[in-house]
Amino acid sequence: MTNKSNSFIENKTQLIQYFKDGIKKDTDLKIGVEHEKFLFNKTDLKRINYDQIKKIFEILKEKGWEPQLEKDKLIGLKRQNQKITTEPGFQYELSGAPFKNIHSVCSENSSHFNELKEVFKSTNITTSSIAYDPFNKLTDIPKNPKERYTIMTAEMPKGGKLSLDMMYKTAGIQINYDYTSEEDFEKKFKIGNYLAPLTIALFANSPFNENKLSGFLSYRGKVWQETNRGGIMSITFENINFEKYIDHAINYPILFLKKNGKYHTPNGQTFRDFLNGNLSFLKGEKPTLEDFENHLGTIFTEIRLKQVIEFRSLDTCNFGCICNGPSFFTGLIYGSLEETYEIIKNWKKEEVMEAYLNAPKQGLNTLLQDKKLIDWAKIFLDISKKGLDKRNELNKSGKNETIYLKHIEEIISNKKTRAEMLIEQYNKTKKLDFLINHDENFSYSGF
């Protein structure tokens, strides 16, 4: 196995090989889900601080989780292929293990959040399954002591006016998919990007900001559109391969660089500069594969490539709908790839981008190719169901992965997103106390 921290990059061929090393066989395709949650103090709904997350981690350590440290500070946990980390404002994130089917993904989430619920019983902490902090001002949110976040807090606002809102006030769901070839990567990458407007609209769950309506159904979606290094990559609408993705990625400025245990800010110099040995503070030194991998993780676009394809446009939601997004896209990506790609492949950049920018506010009423997104939702839901039926991944009760599409079916049937239902509740009392999930049910319904 390549030691990424000691493997210096001498030419672009090594970077292309990095992505080729991510290619999987058709029989080895997995699904990985990362899910973020806000944690609040029960008494005043202020966001938790480092001492409180540390207490949670200390309790979880007793359940077999291994501590992850940075300069003697407990910053995360690991157990087998699962990781727990926190975002800049202590949003709690479970990065799940890669699994063959949605049943296993959902079971993992259920198991962990029940574990977390037990922890909450001995603390003054509760959760809210919403994608944008509805209660707190940006300036009131405690800051995570991770060094990289300190650098990002200083650097990110230079290129996007809502970058700090993204860092501290949003919570999302990310789905990771494998690819079987360069051509397969291109199709999945395009599908994810072209369907970003639909994803934002269908999973909209963030209509509030500072205890009032924000004017958006997915304010998280709006924030990510105005974030440094965010949005939809321009190369999406061209013929793409690994080399083109690399050429695009290395033109981003390096956000931070860790060398010899110390973080550096290269002040606008790009990864291409680094490849050419032209970093001002590391003159003549070349990057390692680890440096490249870290750089890829600081590109915050809707769809992103590492050695998996990351779908990143979904608002987080309550446990009942966490498995909906992964099941929906698994049906399209793994079950009905060709049919899905045939529909979107000739969509024009201008049409997609207009729908993308309108979706956070207009939701399923957004127009794309002269159809409302709710009509596209019906079309792609049917295709997803066919794909999941074709996969025929069964649980212990003999049911396939279509059982997790209920949330989407209800949205389409009612012609209302979760955000619109939350707005209706808010309009009855002009209060947001219903958003707190003191007794959220984390039962796994797939058995």
Residues of each region from the PLM?
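Loop-rich catalytic cores of soluble enzymes, especially ATP-dependent carboxylate-amine ligases
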Residues: K121, T127-S128, Y132-R304
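C-terminal, helix-dominated tail/subdomain
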Residues: V223, N228-Y252, V352-K415
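Structured core elements
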Residues: F38, Q174-N176, E310-R312
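Terminal catalytic/cofactor-binding subdomain
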Residues: M1-K161, K169, A204, C321, ...
